[in-house]
Amino acid sequence: MLKLYIRPVCLLRPEEEVASLSLLVESRREKVRTIKGKENRSRSIAAGLLLRYMLLEEQIPYAEESFGLEEHGKPRLKKDGVFFNLSHAGAYVAGVLSDVPVGVDVE
């Protein structure tokens, strides 16, 4: 399995940012809160929403307990045999879901 997703990113109004954050797991919300700059926050939120969509489409729970951290702090799924990677830059966010370790770079 290899599924690639690419979506445009739009700047969020404050009320849209609040609503979007409520759909993300707490670890992603915490990450977003540390980001300075509206554009960078919007990209990070878009990446989190894309991951949520990717997992739910595959019927994988999007919940805090579904995630762990790799050795160097990179988020990973606890579910065996499912790997993801996200990238965001400029006006796009990209995500990939696979049954083998995988990476994606939107640039």
Language model feature labels by segment:
Residues 1-107:
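Core catalytic alpha/beta fold that binds nucleotide/phospho-ligands
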